[in-house]
Amino acid sequence: MKIRYAAKTDVGMKRTHNEDYFSLIEDEQLFLVADGMGGHASGEVASKMAAETIGEFYQRTREDEDATWPYKMDRSLSYIENRLVCGIKLANLRIFETSNRDLRYKGMGTTIVSCLISGDKIYVGHVGDSRVYRLRDNAIAQLTRDHSLLEDYKEAKPDMTEEEERNFPHKNVITRALGMRETVQVDIRSHQIKSGDVYILCSDGLSGMVVDDQIAQISTGAKSLERAVAELVDAANRNGGTDNITTLLLQCLAA
């Protein structure tokens, strides 16, 4: 599978610094977006630390196949899934320990969303409310479930209206993030890739400002992936830009 990609991050219209971070590990075809949180710029420390820790784990286990993993393998998951989950769990532990050891970073945390491509499959692992969408045949589908109070409430009340969603008082409160606790549950799923698929990784600075249909329209209508990520960021800023905005687009084509 041939992969093309483009990414863009932006501080937005209301924030003074950018706590989002994205990373590409091309040798592994692993792509990451993290949305940090915490006072005094510690959120940007957490998001970068998450991506770097995962990258370091992948490098170490690639160079030394006998390297000891910090967590036991889950027998219900494949080797590829276990490796991704382990990297994310290790990032969680490092952020948690740093937060507890250094008062400058107390309370810091981050979301993480990851896509790893192997053969004709894409593996999606995430914690928090950063998202992955798939564009296929001009239709958009969300492949992740937000770990948020709003999502929990929607599951308890499936007939919730769009207006009720917009006015939900705690819609930005997440229930899971890296660094909140010593251990973390990572959601991971695999999906079959179809040639022509586009996968969109993003922080909630995009998904909270631009509705899904508009994300699809911009992504399919742009002349290139580079134009698409720029136009998505512009749309989020036009709609208020209340948060940092990061988006990473992957296009999968038959080799």
What are these model-predicted stretches?
Residues 1-255:
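PP2C/PPM-type serine/threonine phosphatase catalytic domain
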